[in-house]
């Protein structure tokens, strides 16, 4: 794909040179399946100059401590919830965290009031399901399921707009790190590196309170 024709490239595309330079000079310990160490992720978000002279552009102007706590939360295998008013860079930060850690910010679920549980778990290609019955070929994985299978970060936008019963399904996935597929008598067990970054709007309190 020619990025000159793309109105808004993904973070891992727009800042590919910076991510490559950070990975090449990153000698610090990395959690399993992380592309960069936590220290390098901080540098990617807040900016700095690498030992080889590469300038890293700041992606976030704000409290360094908040960024460090967010990254430490993910590094200790806990999901991250970014809460704030509209326009406070929650989505921007979540995208760049996923890009720096997993190299992929596209495993995204957009929360809405009508979001079904299948959007967090899996669905079916009904044409194949009717023709072949339940099979792996007929299964349509959600972004969260793909993140579990590949050890990457899934992003969930506007968590409080999602119905409470669907939120409950997410809690089970995060606590058990397993997604049962009873139709196939199978399950997906999350690989190391899997995690979730969710955002929530302060002004949506009362729409669907967090479970």
Model-derived segments and spans:
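AAA+ P-loop NTPase catalytic core and its hallmark functional loops
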Residues: 2-211
């Amino acid at each position: 794909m020619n990025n000159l024709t793309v109105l808004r490239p993904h973070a891992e595309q727009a800042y590919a040179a910076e991510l490559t330079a950070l990975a090449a000079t990153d000698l610090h310990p990395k959690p399993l399946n992380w592309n960069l160490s936590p220290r390098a992720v901080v540098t990617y978000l807040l900016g700095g100059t690498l030992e080889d002279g590469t300038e890293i552009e700041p992606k976030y102007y704000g409290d360094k401590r908040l960024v460090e706590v967010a990254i430490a939360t993910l590094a200790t295998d806990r999901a991250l919830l970014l809460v704030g008013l509209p326009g406070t860079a929650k989505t921007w930060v979540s995208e760049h965290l996923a890009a720096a850690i997993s190299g992929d910010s596209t495993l995204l679920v957009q929360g809405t009031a009508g979001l079904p549980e299948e959007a967090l778990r899996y669905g079916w290609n009904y044409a194949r399901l009717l023709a072949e019955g339940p099979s792996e070929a007929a299964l349509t994985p959600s972004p969260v399921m793909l993140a579990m299978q590949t050890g990457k970060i899934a992003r969930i936008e506007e968590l409080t707009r999602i119905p409470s019963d669907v939120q409950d399904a997410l809690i089970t996935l995060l606590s058990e790190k397993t997604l049962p597929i009873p139709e196939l008598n199978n399950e997906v067990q999350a690989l190391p590196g899997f995690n979730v970054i969710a955002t929530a709007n302060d002004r949506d309190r009362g729409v669907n309170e967090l479970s």
